Amino acid sequence: MGRRKIEIKAIKDDRNRSVTFLKRKGGLFKKAHELAVLCSVDVAVIIFGHNKKLYEFSSCDMRETLGRYQYYGPPHEHKGPEDFNGKRDDDDDEDETTPAPEEMQPTTQNPPAVVPAHIPSHPGFQHVNHAPSASPPISNGIPFDPRHGTPQPQGASRPSSRNHLRRVSSNLGPQQHHGTPPPPPQNGFAYIPNPSMYHPNANPNIAQQPRPPQFAHYGPQQPLPPHAIPPHPMPQPVPPHHQAPQHLPQHPHPLAQQTPAMGLSQPPHASIPQVAQPFLPEQGRNSMPPAFPTEQSQPPRPVSLPDVSSADQMVGPLKVETSPSPPHQRSLSSKSRSIFTPIDDRGSVLARHFGLGPPTCESPRTESADVKAEAKQNDSKEIKPPAQPVAPPPPPRTTADAARSQSAPDIKPPPRTNSGQLPSKRPQLKVQIPSENSDRGSATADSSSSTGNQTVTPAKANPDTNHSGVVLPPPSPSAGAILSAGATGPPNPFARPPPPGTASQNSNAYNSNNNIETPISALPSRFVSDALLPSPSSFFPEWGFGRSGPDTNMLPSPLTFPTPAVQTGPGFAREDEQEKKRKSPDSGPSIEGTAKKSKT
């Protein structure tokens, strides 16, 4: 009697609307609770407010309720705004406590009527699961048509919720509902969103870029469901393959469902990304198929297992490629090994001394061969045959004649195994330089007597090794290091044969200095003058320590741009002069340079 009727339409005034919302929301929750208790039913009410806040009431766990809704068939009764527009006059008694139609729909049978439209922004349970799925556009766009059991007005808003909720329940929904109810709605559209979850495994490359990282989550996740929640993985992959033909025309992003075919064809093409990914698909798919057999496993298996096999095949070729790669290097470097053939084939000094002291000739090289064998095993752990050929290499390296005396087929493997390590061999030339005296003392019986007093840098010795290889003259003063440097390495490209007199003088000078028998410097011979080096300033003339050109009296300026003629700042000129004074000991004319600079 005292209650006035209000027209059910949107309230424009913000204050009145907020008051009405709070009042009717409380009444709706109260009614929902009473209904749940009185009738022993599960009620879920979800309200998205204007202030972007979420209000929900649930007589039991909200996620469980939504998951159950996802797997139920078409609702037995569905109410929409049009159902209440004309009946409002008859229901005046309940008007005070019942909310507006938008708020009333979330009750028991149709909570998603409101949920769907807004669910992407749902901050609570939905948002967490919605992020991994990585396909909001797919879910929102897909399933308007496939929704068969409900009136069309709700079709627009409901499918989006259906998709998102399905993702939630696929991980969180109760297990007992998986078996029986799903089939009718599944063929409608129940699992459309799931291709986006499942096929990032099959086709992470074709899909959008954000998917592979999310697939990294699916790899760990899906091994778990087969053990913890067996039913979930089964329905997920199976329906997408059955339903893919139905929904491809309607699908805004057909990539997710075309992936079964593309996933098979892709691994051969995209070999580089597959290197990292074959393992992830194997995790996902090897864990998935065990769950499939309980339901229809035929469609997903062809898709999953071929990918796994193709992934294995991809891994296989990669392993094969990694193993052949050392042979390629060997073949390339075996060509470069031709540097050694002139020395070996002449058989010059080595052939003569090989019979005298073969152990000493081979001892340093067998060590180097062992080092190379270790390096080789590190390079290709899968190739173990080279370990056997490593034993023959020392003879072929020392002399080709000795190698030929063994057996012709043995020569072919060793160059491959050894020459693969040429890059590591060249440093060993310099490592073996200190041991040249021991080699010389034992192996070179002829030249040791004359060269015991005269040792020259191996840089200058190498050219003579070539000459001695041709004619074998009487041992020259520079033939000392022939075994260590000349036989094992290529001739020094920097070497310049010294004049005999200066060579002997230099060697005598070296020996007079504390009996230094090793080279006095490791620099190439082009930097070494005929006498002992006067000062380090002549090593690298381009460094500008001492100049021997037209600009001898000018030190190089530390500044590349012209310096100002007038002293603009006190500190600038002082620093400049200090630098020149500091350099004056190395080059005599620097004082003149400073004087000239200061005059200008």
Swiss-Prot record:
GO terms for molecular function: protein dimerization activity; RNA polymerase II transcription regulatory region sequence-specific DNA binding. Residues 1-61 form the MADS-box domain. Disruption phenotype: Affects sporulation and reduces the expression of the DHN-melanin gene cluster. Also strongly decreases the production of fumiquinazoline C. Induction: Expression is inceased two fold when the MAPK mpkB is deleted. Its main location: nucleus. Gene3D superfamilies: Transcription factor, MADS-box (3.40.1810.10). It comes from the Eukaryota. Residues 151-160, 328-339, 453-468 have a biased composition (Polar residues). GO terms for cellular component: nucleus. Residues 75-89, 364-384 have a biased composition (Basic and acidic residues). Keywords: DNA-binding, Nucleus, Transcription, Transcription regulation. It is found in: Nucleus. Residues 243-260, 440-452, 503-515 have a biased composition (Low complexity). Residues 71-518, 542-600 are annotated as: Disordered. It holds the Pfam family SRF-TF. InterPro entries: MADS-box/MEF2_TF (IPR050142), MEF2-like_N (IPR033896), TF_MADSbox (IPR002100), TF_MADSbox_sf (IPR036879). Residues 222-242, 386-397, 490-501 have a biased composition (Pro residues). One of its GO terms (biological process) is positive regulation of transcription by RNA polymerase II. Belongs to the MEF2 family. MADS-box transcription factor involved in the activation of the dihydroxynaphthalene (DHN)-melanin pathway and the fumiquinazoline C cluster during conidiogenesis. Specifically recognizes a DNA binding site (poly A/T stretch) identified in the promoter sequence of the gene coding for the polyketide synthase pksP and of the fumiquinazoline C cluster (fmq) promoters. PANTHER family: SERUM RESPONSE FACTOR HOMOLOG. This is MADS-box transcription factor rlmA. It comes from Aspergillus fumigatus (strain CBS 144.89 / FGSC A1163 / CEA10) (Neosartorya fumigata).
